[in-house]
């Protein structure tokens, strides 16, 4: 059973980084405020046990990671620090260059963009390797890196160490070679089972956990000022959602009549329960019966997505989604049936007419008004669930004089270098509203 430890002490005004000597001699701490919880956690790493560290976002996990690396360096060992994405790895690399009292050439940023032939030579010379788990796991498998050469491995966002993710393989290598592993995360799991799985995957025998309620952490938690703005859907949106609800319930009733749905009304079926219907259908034996069930089930899922889009995101995302169904190269019989539904055709026509007259979801007006009132030269981030909504928001803001930019992931074909460029321009003030998923 791992040793679980959490501090409840009040902050000590006399704390200093010198408490961590001799390791603090390897870290530039002049511009870093010492915090009791960080010092306590760092001291816990000194014992050499593999450890899970849980700390809320924004409370200095990077400082802890750098000191963990410094411990290995002091003992004459090398260190690895990994992060799930290249941009995050780059941030850690820049932090290590800035904070560790090492020649920058001793710190290597190792990502997939580095050619495999060069990686082996570069990795053999580096005292600290910072990179992505996919690249390092590939190099471990190919023999370009030997885990036994390292004294410590730090995994940022270690909650990814589940299933077949590269973190899991790296953690297994640490266990096999007896290398200390330190996992950092703000979210170890939503239930006990997931937390236990993470602990086992990391091989952690010690847990250092802090929450925003701990006395030594609370003073550093920034308060949130949450304001909820309620808007009422327009007449046209209410009309279309009513139409979609009617179509969905027609199909859901067919599933209800054969015992696959607990109710014929989709608003009374939790989404999680609805998704479970698919598992029940897979276990059906009769092929004809099964085909009809699958047809109605997929019909419901496709139109529920359309319902979610128009009710929460607006007319444009709804129309855009229906158009994406229409332009698919290989349309299923379900999609053909949906598109030929006269009720849906009328709903799409009404939505297009409303868009032509300049109507959109009332949230757009509320968002624009809020930003124009609150910005005053400041920056803001706007989050939306769907990429089509991001495009709508950005266009609306730009059309009204707000300097906005969308930020989407690689599924949209955006390269990491382009993502980094957007973030850099946001930091430099080239635009002051970032709209992202």
Regions inferred by a protein language model and the residue ranges of each:
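Helicase motor interdomain insertion/brace
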Residues: 10, 166, 170, 207-218, ...
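Conserved pre-motif I regulatory segment
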Residues: 10-54
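Walker A/P-loop
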Residues: 48-68
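Motif I (Walker A/P-loop) of helicase-class P-loop NTPases
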Residues: 61-70, 165-169, 367
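Conserved Walker A/P-loop ATP-binding site and its immediately adjacent core
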Residues: 62-64, 77-98, 188-194, 385-390
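Conserved helix-turn-beta segment of the N-terminal RecA-like "Helicase ATP-binding" lobe
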Residues: 88-111, 199-203
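Conserved helicase ATPase core of P-loop NTP-dependent helicases/translocases
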Residues: 114-122, 379-383, 389-396, 402-437
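SF2 helicase catalytic motif II
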Residues: 133-194
């Amino acid at each position: 059973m791992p040793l679980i430890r959490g501090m409840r002490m009040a902050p000590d005004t006399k704390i200093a980084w010198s408490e961590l000597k001799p390791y603090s001699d390897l870290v530039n701490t002049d511009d870093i405020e010492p915090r009791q919880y960080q010092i306590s956690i760092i001291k816990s790493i000194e014992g050499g046990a593999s450890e899970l560290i849980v700390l809320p976002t924004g409370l200095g996990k990077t400082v802890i990671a750098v000191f963990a690396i410094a411990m290995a360096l002091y003992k004459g060992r090398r260190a690895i620090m990994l992060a799930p994405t290249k941009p995050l790895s780059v941030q850690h690399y820049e932090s290590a260059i800035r904070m560790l009292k090492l020649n920058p050439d001793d710190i290597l940023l190792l990502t997939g963009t580095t050619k495999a032939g060069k990686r082996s030579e570069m990795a053999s010379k580096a005292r600290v390797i910072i990179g992505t788990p996919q690249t390092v796991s590939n190099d471990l498998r190919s023999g370009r890196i030997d885990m036994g050469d390292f004294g410590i491995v730090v995994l940022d966002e270690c909650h990814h160490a589940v299933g077949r993710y590269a973190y899991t393989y790296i953690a297994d290598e640490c266990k096999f070679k007896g290398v200390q592993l330190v996992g950092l995360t703000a979210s170890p799991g939503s239930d006990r089972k997931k937390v236990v799985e993470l602990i086992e995957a990391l091989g952690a025998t010690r847990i250092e956990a802090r929450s925003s309620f701990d006395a030594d952490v609370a003073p550093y938690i920034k308060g949130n000022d949450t304001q909820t703005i309620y808007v009422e859907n327009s007449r046209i949106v209410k009309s279309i959602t009513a139409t979609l609800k009617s179509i969905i319930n027609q199909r859901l009733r067919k599933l209800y009549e054969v015992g696959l749905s607990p109710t014929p009304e989709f608003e009374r079926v939790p989404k999680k329960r609805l998704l479970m219907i698919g598992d029940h259908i897979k276990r059906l034996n009769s092929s004809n019966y099964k085909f009809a069930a699958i047809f109605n089930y997929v019909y419901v899922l496709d139109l529920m997505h359309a319902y979610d889009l128009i009710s929460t995101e607006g007319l444009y995302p709804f129309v855009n989604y229906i158009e994406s169904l229409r332009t698919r190269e290989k349309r299923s019989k379900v999609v053909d049936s949906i598109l030929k539904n006269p009720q849906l055709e009328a709903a799409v026509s009404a939505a297009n007419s409303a868009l032509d007259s300049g109507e959109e979801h009332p949230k757009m007006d509320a968002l624009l008004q809020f930003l124009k009132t609150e910005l005053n030269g400041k920056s803001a981030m706007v989050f939306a669930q769907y990429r089509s909504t991001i495009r709508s928001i950005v266009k609306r803001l730009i059309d009204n004089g707000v300097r906005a930019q969308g930020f989407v992931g690689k599924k949209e074909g955006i390269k990491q270098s382009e993502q980094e460029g957007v973030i850099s321009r946001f930091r430099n003030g080239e635009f002051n509203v970032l709209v992202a998923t």
